[in-house]
Design a protein with these regions (language model features):
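Mature, function-bearing regions of proteins
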Residues: 1-315
Length: 315
């Protein structure tokens, strides 16, 4: 950790126009699924293992201030706007940066000023999204992603990084660079109190419910949520690097791997059978349908007799 003045992300230039994630991309196909919320839990765990991020979220995040469910929903809302929001995506990127700018504090570990916009930490937040998704191919699609697919995922991850004003100097440009970057981060990541709290909640199946929920219903809700909480645990721990599991003091058995694989095989079958309306978040569903409708219109336009006239340019 270094001083905030040395580490804060520079303000974006006014003439920078970030590219948006294509709505027919792999990123758009998978980010909008309901299981994204579960898979991304592994990314959040890795973020909580970064010392700067851990201290900042420990002070400022609702995850550790009595509203973890609300924080998760708002985070997913934000990610969906980055990916499917169109012009709103740019506004959301600006909002996220502005929201994090005032989050500064004196580190209890080093005594130095730290910031939510610490470049190393801010890069790590976005990089974990790629790392988890690239490693999650066996769960998401039933096989490892190909090199070409990983290149596409990283391309869109870099687009999101720019959208969120992440400093791009040193940000990985290839899958190999990302792998090397991950190796350099292993020693930085720690079993922070925040990460250990998250892991303990996963192991015990504890859920902090909204104060509006009657306490008499807590036991029933815990029972109803037990299968989902087990899936959450398996997904997060199963996607963590073994070295990170060791730091957090958790193991991973062959039986747990088989159980996780079986569950996601069932989920993939359900996704193939169920209509998209039931498998995607509403914003993702409507954005993808809107894009598909426009693409079909373009295809119909190509059949116009006017395009057969010599000298006519096809748009």
């Amino acid at each position: 950790m270094t001083a905030t003045s040395d580490l804060e992300v520079p303000s974006p230039a006014d003439d920078e126009t970030p590219e948006l994630v294509p709505l027919d991309s792999l990123t758009a196909e998978h980010t909008g699924r309901w299981t994204f919320l579960i898979v991304e839990g592994a990314a959040f765990m890795m973020q909580a293992m970064h010392p700067v991020i851990a201290e900042i979220v420990g002070r400022y995040s609702a995850s550790f201030q009595g509203d973890p469910g609300g924080r998760a929903i708002r985070s997913i809302d934000s990610v969906l706007r980055w990916t499917y929001g169109g012009t709103e995506a740019v506004a959301e990127g600006n909002r996220v940066r502005a929201m994090h700018k005032p989050m500064m504090m004196k580190s209890a570990e080093t005594g130095k000023q730290i910031s939510a916009l610490n470049p190393e930490a801010y890069q790590w937040v976005i990089a974990t999204g790629y790392i988890v998704n690239a490693q999650g191919g066996r769960l998401l699609i039933g096989r490892e992603f190909t090199d070409a697919e990983k290149a596409e995922l990283l391309r869109d991850n870099r687009r999101l990084a720019r959208l969120l004003h992440v400093p791009m100097r040193g940000y990985p440009e290839t899958d190999q660079e990302m792998a090397d970057y991950f190796e350099t981060m292993i020693d930085t990541l720690q079993a922070t109190p925040q990460a250990l709290k998250l892991m303990d909640d996963l192991i015990t199946g504890q859920v902090e419910l909204s104060p509006s929920v009657p306490k008499a219903l807590y036991p029933l809700i815990q029972v109803v949520l037990r299968p989902a909480l087990r899936l959450n645990y398996l997904s997060i721990v199963g996607l963590l690097d073994p070295r990170l599991r060791d730091k957090l003091g958790v193991g991973w058995s062959a039986e747990e791997e088989r159980q996780l694989t079986r569950i996601y095989k069932t989920i993939r079958i359900a996704y193939r059978v169920l209509p998209d309306r039931f498998t995607y978040f509403p914003l993702a569903y409507h954005a993808r349908k809107h894009h598909q409708c426009l693409e079909k219109m373009k295809q119909r336009q190509q059949k116009s007799y006017a395009y057969r006239v010599p000298g006519t340019n096809t748009p």
